[in-house]
């Protein structure tokens, strides 16, 4: 059986998403599911696009849209799992989700992680992020 040895080939560049170490190293985030950690990495990537495109609210806070159907496709999961994964992030203090109503997708505001309280956010039941 032969294997291919890969060498740097610029014409076949691969895209990467950064996964922050603090999600695995900080005790506060140890209860967070791996799906929530991966989704947060993709949210951070979209945050950079939102910043470049000038997507900020009236207070200057960067926001993004991540419809539930896109979370389902990204994580290869069902709708309820996608909603619960966003809810986990909200309870962990990683994002703020603002409902817009009238069939519009929710705004997601990524938050700073330095001052997140230590809480068991998987058991919390308040709020429901939906698209």
Residue ranges and their predicted role:
Residues 37-41, 69, 106, 123, ...:
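Active-site-proximal helix/loop capping residues that flank conserved catalytic or ligand/cofactor
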Residues 24, 43, 85-87, 128-129:
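A periodicity- and composition-biased signal for non-globular, repetitive helical segments
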Residues 34, 46-110:
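Winged helix-turn-helix DNA-binding recognition segment
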Residues 2-3, 112-131:
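Charged low-complexity intrinsically disordered patches
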Residues 22, 100, 113-115:
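Generic structural motif
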Residues 1-69:
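Short recognition helix of helix-turn-helix/winged-helix DNA-binding domains
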């Amino acid at each position: 059986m032969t294997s291919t040895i890969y060498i740097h080939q610029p014409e076949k560049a691969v895209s990467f998403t950064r996964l922050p170490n603090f999600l695995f190293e900080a005790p506060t985030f140890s209860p967070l599911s791996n799906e929530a950690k991966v989704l947060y990495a993709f949210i951070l990537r979209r945050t950079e696009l939102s910043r470049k495109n000038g997507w900020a609210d009236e207070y200057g806070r960067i926001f993004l849209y991540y419809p539930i159907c896109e979370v389902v496709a990204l994580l290869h999961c069902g709708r309820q799992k996608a909603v619960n994964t966003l809810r986990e992030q909200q309870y962990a203090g990683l994002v703020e989700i603002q409902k817009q109503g009238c069939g519009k997708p929710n705004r997601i505001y990524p938050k700073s992680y330095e001052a997140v309280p230590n809480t068991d956010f998987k058991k919390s039941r308040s709020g429901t992020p939906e698209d």
